[in-house]
Amino acid sequence: GIHIAAPGLAVQPGSPVDGLGRARLSTVYMPGYKVTMLPDDVVQTYTLQEGRDCPSVSLYVMLDEATLEIKSSETRLERVPIAHNLRHDQLDAVVTEQWLTDTAFEHQNDSQPASALREQLSFLYRLAKDLKAKREVVRGKPETFNRPDYNFRLVREAGAQGTEPQGQEEVQISIRQRGAPLDLIVAEAMILANSTWGSWMAELGVPGIYRSQASLAPGVKVRMGTKALPHAGIGVKSYAWSTSPLRR
């Protein structure tokens, strides 16, 4: 199952919260601080927080466990109990490809709850690699992650986290390699959800917010629209923006 926060259950069209979201359009991120698209109390109420039963739009995908062929899917609006929040910055060094694929390999300090979820994470990693490989066939060439991402962090006094920076903070820059197992699992889950929901809305004649790209030829840019069209860069028949309702 893929579970997405559902703030739209409470945000009514034309309401002050709806107006604020329409004015801001997206959350603004900067090192050590962010300006959220929605008011913080709305974000905190609807974020998928560990230890709570949270409103969610859920995509359930039924597949053949041996071949990983997708057989069917179902979308539900429900409350989902959130058991754990697994965070990249805490677990990328633990949830490695070797840890996921070699059952005999053990870290000296395995992190909980990741160690308790090793079997499930290993399957999700196998599924993510299969989904990526199938997209690359449609795409016509493999995706490469040869350029790293950079994390920016402000060194701040205790108690200052989450407050607006003052300008004198020390900035720490670290490298985070794209395509790490957790990164790949999340990315492929989001692509699967956005492409599945995009195709479903198109079948029903419901407009959505789509990203599309006609081809990978030089100069062909990604476009936004309200109709489902192929996205050559991702390798899917349609790609709707559906998985970041608290951010944009």
Where are these regions (language model features)?
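Electropositive polyanion-binding surfaces
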Residues: 1-248
